[in-house]
Amino acid sequence: ILGETKRWLDIYFRGAEPDFMPPLHPIGSDFQQVVWKILRQIPYGTTRTYGDIAAQIARARGVAKMSAQAVGGAVGHNDISILIPCHRVVGKSGSLTGYAAGLEKKIRLLTLEKVDMSRFFVPKKGTAL
């Protein structure tokens, strides 16, 4: 597993999309597992909002609404950053929020993936998702 993960990271940090995923077995609540599975489905070089993910979960569960803040909490408890790409999740209106390794690293990862950064901004402290 470690060899596969190293190979995946080597490919990723060369600025290419790896064509495989090493096996991952993150430990978390059922809700966190659902969110992390969705994160792994966000295509390389794209982003989703916390609200997008909340709406996807709500549809799958047959409920009217799901909290974007609850999604943010699950994203924040992801211990396998990059492989479970929480850096691809952004706030509504393009705000770059909530990356445990810091917003500078989030910006670098999105830039590495050639995401168009012109539509994003770093919010002032205290701004919600």
Which positions does each model-derived feature cover?
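Basic nucleic-acid-binding alpha-helical/helix-turn surface characteristic of O6-alkylguanine DNA
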Residues: 1-62, 66, 112-129
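Short glycine/serine-rich loop segments
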Residues: 64-108, 117
